[in-house]
């Protein structure tokens, strides 16, 4: 499974990248706003930092302008993936850009119907939003499973990029079902290391080391 980091914070990306935990990055207008930086400037810095795909989202809602914005974003770096919303115009933009040989991430997916359309339009990635489905008392994992089944049935190459990740369980469940990629905030990825028994075991080891006067250096 590939790990993408869902942030525009350079230091957070760098920390995880140094550990080999970053296969790509996803951004959106809200994350860019939170960073307080120019979209082109911060996206370029992210692209210089990581080798994998960096999703940069268009801001337009009509296909023609989405395509123009996508081409502008593609000028930033070779590893840019253009991110478009799952609307009819977004699918038109996806088809045009992928036909030109570019990578496209179709975002804001909430149904397998939508995911099927995105795959037919040539999407590189489909981003189903797990957490937002959970917010309205639907099981986001059911959607991941439905998309996986449909894509496997017909051999679609579109990768399932599980998004709106809120918890470690979201990551693990996505992995169990067979999502190709997860994108999560740095804090959620880092929290995967935590377990109370690990802490308890380490405390016991440290107590024994102190009692025995063990030193390595």
UniProtKB/Swiss-Prot annotation:
GO terms for biological process: carbohydrate metabolic process; pentose-phosphate shunt. Pathway: Carbohydrate degradation; pentose phosphate pathway; D-glyceraldehyde 3-phosphate and beta-D-fructose 6-phosphate from D-ribose 5-phosphate and D-xylulose 5-phosphate (non-oxidative stage): step 2/3. Its main location: cytoplasm. GO terms for molecular function: aldehyde-lyase activity; transaldolase activity. InterPro entries: Aldolase_TIM, TAL/FSA, Transaldolase_3B, Transaldolase_3B/F6P_aldolase, Transaldolase_AS, TSA/FSA_arc/bac. GO terms for cellular component: cytoplasm. The keyword Transferase applies. PROSITE patterns: TRANSALDOLASE_1 (PS01054), TRANSALDOLASE_2 (PS00958). It comes from the Bacteria. The active site is at residue 83. Pfam families: TAL_FSA. It is an enzyme of class 2 (transferase). It is found in: Cytoplasm. Its EC number is 2.2.1.2. The keyword Lipid metabolism does not apply. It catalyses: D-sedoheptulose 7-phosphate + D-glyceraldehyde 3-phosphate = D-erythrose 4-phosphate + beta-D-fructose 6-phosphate. Keywords: Cytoplasm, Pentose shunt, Schiff base, Transferase. Belongs to the transaldolase family. Type 3B subfamily. PANTHER family: FRUCTOSE-6-PHOSPHATE ALDOLASE 1-RELATED (PTHR10683:SF40), TRANSALDOLASE (PTHR10683). Transaldolase is important for the balance of metabolites in the pentose-phosphate pathway. HAMAP family: Transaldolase_3b. This is Probable transaldolase. It comes from Ruegeria sp. (strain TM1040) (Silicibacter sp.).
């Amino acid at each position: 499974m590939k790990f993408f980091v869902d942030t525009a914070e350079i230091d957070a990306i760098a920390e995880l990248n140094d550990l080999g935990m970053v296969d790509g990055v996803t951004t959106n207008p809200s994350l860019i706003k939170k960073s307080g930086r120019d979209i082109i400037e911060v996206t370029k810095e992210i692209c210089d930092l990581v080798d994998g795909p960096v999703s940069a989202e268009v801001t337009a809602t009509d296909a023609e302008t989405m395509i123009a914005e996508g081409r502008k974003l593609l000028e930033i770096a070779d590893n840019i993936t253009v991110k478009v919303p799952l609307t009819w115009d977004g699918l038109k933009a996806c088809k045009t850009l992928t036909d030109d040989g570019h990578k496209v991430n179709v975002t804001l997916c909430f149904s397998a119907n939508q995911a099927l359309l995105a795959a037919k339009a040539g999407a590189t990635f489909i981003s189903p939003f797990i957490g937002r489905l959970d917010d309205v008392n639907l099981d986001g994992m059911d959607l991941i499973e439905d998309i996986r089944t449909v894509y496997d049935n017909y051999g679609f190459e579109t990768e399932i990029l599980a998004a709106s990740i809120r918890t470690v369980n979201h990551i693990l469940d996505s992995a169990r079902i067979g999502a190709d990629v997860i994108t999560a905030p740095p804090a959620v990825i880092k929290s995967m290391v935590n377990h109370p028994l690990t802490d308890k075991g380490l405390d016991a080891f440290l107590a024994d080391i102190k009692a025995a006067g063990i030193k390595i250096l």
